[in-house]
């Protein structure tokens, strides 16, 4: 198993917590301070890249996953696809709706033009909460013909049960709270 201690230290030290955001009862993990710290960002990207060194494509989840996904793809020499929130891409798109801890949403990727068929994909995002977003992302890229070889996140909020929802996928979280 890869040692992620430098990444864990950076995330633990730099994460900003916001209670009752974006709505009452939700505790939001803001990783922006981790990303804005050059060393913190570097060790986090390196740790996420170590999760699946042979992946062909990174599926980066809108929006903070974009920051991580681009870095991980660059580190691995792989491609990256931005998994967008609904309405951000021109048609045709593939879409997947899901429930998250404070509402519902839909994710989209371009239909047919990004060549995912048969390719290995690592899904990357910042936080695992209920698992709705990551499950929808995995199902979405699978609907495009990709093989999801793993999911990697910076921070997992264990009490929200996301890991159980993602049980069929190998999952790495750098920090679990």
From Swiss-Prot:
One of its GO terms (molecular function) is adenine binding. CDD domains: PRTases_typeI (cd06223). It holds the Pfam family Pribosyltran. Its EC number is 2.4.2.7. The keyword Cytoplasm applies. Keywords: Cytoplasm, Glycosyltransferase, Purine salvage, Transferase. GO terms for biological process: adenine salvage; AMP salvage; purine ribonucleoside salvage. Its main location: cytoplasm. It is an enzyme of class 2 (transferase). InterPro entries: Ade_phspho_trans, PRibTrfase_dom, PRTase-like, UPRTase/APRTase. It is found in: Cytoplasm. The keyword Nucleotide-binding does not apply. Pathway: Purine metabolism; AMP biosynthesis via salvage pathway; AMP from adenine: step 1/1. It catalyses: AMP + diphosphate = 5-phospho-alpha-D-ribose 1-diphosphate + adenine. GO terms for cellular component: cytoplasm. Catalyzes a salvage reaction resulting in the formation of AMP, that is energically less costly than de novo synthesis. PANTHER family: ADENINE PHOSPHORIBOSYLTRANSFERASE. Homodimer. Belongs to the purine/pyrimidine phosphoribosyltransferase family. NCBIfam families: PRK02304.1-5 (NF002636). This is Adenine phosphoribosyltransferase. The lineage of its organism: Bacteria, Bacillati, Actinomycetota, Actinomycetes, Mycobacteriales.
């Amino acid at each position: 198993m890869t040692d992620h201690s430098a990444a864990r230290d950076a995330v633990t030290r730099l994460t900003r917590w916001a209670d009752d955001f974006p709505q009452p009862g939700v505790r939001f993990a803001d990783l922006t301070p981790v990303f804005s710290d050059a060393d913190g960002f570097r060790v986090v990207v390196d740790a996420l890249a170590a999760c699946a060194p042979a992946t062909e494509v990174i599926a980066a989840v809108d929006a903070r996953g974009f920051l991580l996904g681009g870095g991980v793809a660059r580190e691995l020499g792989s491609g990256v696809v931005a998994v967008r929130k609904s309405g951000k891409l021109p048609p045709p798109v593939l879409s997947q709706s899901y429930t998250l801890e404070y509402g519902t949403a839909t994710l989209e990727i371009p239909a047919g033009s990004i060549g995912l068929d048969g390719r290995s994909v690592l899904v990357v995002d910042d936080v695992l909460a209920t698992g709705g977003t990551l499950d929808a992302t995995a199902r979405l890229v699978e609907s495009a013909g990709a093989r999801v070889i793993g999911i990697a996140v910076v921070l997992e909020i264990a009490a929200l049960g996301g890991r159980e929802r993602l049980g069929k996928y190998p999952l790495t979280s750098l920090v679990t709270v």
